[in-house]
Structure formats: C-alpha cells, structure tokens
Amino acid sequence: MELQIKIQNFQGPFDLLLHLIKKNQLDIYNINISEITGQYMEYIESLKEMDLEVTSEFIVIASTLLQIKSRELLPKIQDEEEEEISEENPEKILLDKLIEYKKFKNVASYLKGRLEKGFTVFSKKPEIIEKKEEEDKDIFIDVTILELYNLYNELITKYKDKINLSNTIPEEIELEEFKIGDKMNYLKSRIIENKNLSFSQISKECSCKGEVIVTFLALLELIRIKIVKVVQEGNFKEIYLERMEENEADELYY
C-alpha cells in the first residue's frame, strides 16, 4: 500500500503548483511557468528539515522549473534554437502533466462528494415480485366507437371543470378542528365498549386525514399516561387497542 504524505496541506509538487497558479490568478492553459518558480523555491527552502525521501518529488520539479527559467534567461544562438525546436519542450511537458493532474484531482473531489452524499441516502431493499399471469380478456367486447367517444368527452369535460382558470377560490373552505383531548375521551369510551377494537376500525370512522392524525396523537398520549396499551402480533399486522389494568401500568417503565 502506497503511503501518501501531506506536507503543509500539499499532496506532492503538482498540488503545490496548482495552489500557486490559483493564488496568482493565472490561467493554467496560458501560463509562463517561470512566473511561479520563485515562490516554489521559497517553499522548497522551508522543507530543508524534512526527510529527503519525502521532499525528493518536490526537488525534481524544482530542478525542472530552474531549467525552464535558465533557458529563458540565457541568450540563444541559432543552432540552439533549431535544436530546441527538435527536442521536447520541458515547459510543455510539465504543463501537460500539471493539467492532467488537475483533471484527476477534480474527479477525485467529485467522487469524494458523491461518497459522502451516499452515506445520507437509504435505498429500498429489493423485493421478489411474483409474476402475474395476464388474463387474455377482450375489454372492448360489446363496446362501440360511439360509446368510447362519449366516454372520452365525459372525461374531458370533468377535467376542464376541475381547472380554475380565474385563479380565485370559488367558495370558503371551512377549517375542521379536532382536539386531542376530545379524541382521548372518545377512544377511552370506545375501548370500554369494545374490548377488541382495532386502530384501522377507528381510522375508517374518521372523516378526513386531519382527524386520523389527531386520533393517532390522542392514542399516543393515552399510551404515554398508561391508560391504553396496543397489541400487534407482528410488523404491518393489525394494531389492537386495549384498556390497561392498574397492575400492568405499575410494571411498565418509560
């Protein structure tokens, strides 16, 4: 396993070069690499006390930077210019490697973000879906084209009637109020009357979702104060409500 050592928050020389390019607001695709040579060498000076094996990669890049800068400062004669054209440009090679490193670093950052986001996502476990045999039935038996047309028009008319083009409320909406205390008293009386009372039975008697929610909260409160207990044989099975006896309440601890 390869050991990656961070030196003052930089993972290798290319990471340092990218930092200097960003710090000096330079374009990586159009840069004179010698512009950041001085700053790079200042950083190398601060690594004198570090292990040579750790700083060797930094020193290799530093020598390349000095080579590039020295070639720019020294005068060129015609023979050297022709030789330079035929040889590979060290500055171009370094920039190509730096651009490639930047691409991999961006991809690594993206994958890290996806990994961290994945810890907050929970997927549903796969189920075994039984294949149902398709019944070969002709649903259009004794149905005429005219009857289909009339049915289509009826559906379109109902759909248009539901659309509120004026963006106004045609009638006042009355707020249905349900109190938890009232539902608690109602549940206690129902449990006394019916010893085998299920929550689904209570829910069916509710007129809306809001009443179901208030009824459920009332049930939780009755359980908390040890007046009612619920019995369920297994997950997703029916929930039955029973009155709690005094001796049972003394044995429970919350």
Curated annotation (Swiss-Prot):
InterPro entries (UniProt xref): ScpA (IPR003768), ScpA-like_C (IPR023093)
Keywords from the UniProt entry: Cell cycle, Cell division, Chromosome partition, Cytoplasm
UniProt keyword Cell cycle present: yes
Any GO BP annotation: DNA replication
Localisation per UniProt entry: Cytoplasm
Superkingdom to which the source organism belongs: Bacteria
Pfam families referenced in this protein's UniProt entry, alphabetically: SMC_ScpA
Gene Ontology CC annotations of this record: cytoplasm
The keyword Cytoplasm is annotated on this UniProt entry: yes
PANTHER family: SEGREGATION AND CONDENSATION PROTEIN A
Oligomer status and interactors: Component of a cohesin-like complex composed of ScpA, ScpB and the Smc homodimer, in which ScpA and ScpB bind to the head domain of Smc. The presence of the three proteins is required for the association of the complex with DNA.
UniProt function note: Participates in chromosomal partition during cell division. May act via the formation of a condensin-like complex containing Smc and ScpB that pull DNA away from mid-cell into both cell halves.
Family: Belongs to the ScpA family.
The protein's name: Segregation and condensation protein A
Classification of source organism: Bacteria, Bacillati, Bacillota, Clostridia, Eubacteriales
Gene name linked to the record: scpA
